[in-house]
């Protein structure tokens, strides 16, 4: 991890991307389950 100076580490990008994807999927399923999926 000594070569990540000035750049974002790849594991941070992967973690953030994973959280965002899981959050979007969760909101989509929660919205469709609550009957609000059409408003998205």
Curated annotation (Swiss-Prot):
The keyword Chloroplast applies. Keywords: Chloroplast, Membrane, Photosynthesis, Photosystem II, Plastid, Reaction center, Thylakoid, Transmembrane, Transmembrane helix. It is found in: Plastid, Chloroplast thylakoid membrane. One of its GO terms (cellular component) is chloroplast thylakoid membrane. The chain crosses the membrane at residues 8-28. One of its GO terms (biological process) is photosynthesis. NCBIfam families: PRK02565.1. Belongs to the PsbJ family. PSII is composed of 1 copy each of membrane proteins PsbA, PsbB, PsbC, PsbD, PsbE, PsbF, PsbH, PsbI, PsbJ, PsbK, PsbL, PsbM, PsbT, PsbX, PsbY, PsbZ, Psb30/Ycf12, at least 3 peripheral proteins of the oxygen-evolving complex and a large number of cofactors. It forms dimeric complexes. This is Photosystem II reaction center protein J. It comes from Pisum sativum.
């Amino acid at each position: 991890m000594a070569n990540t100076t000035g750049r974002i580490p790849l594991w941070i990008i992967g973690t953030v991307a994973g959280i965002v994807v899981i959050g979007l999927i969760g909101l989509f399923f929660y919205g469709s389950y609550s009957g609000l999926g059409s408003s998205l």
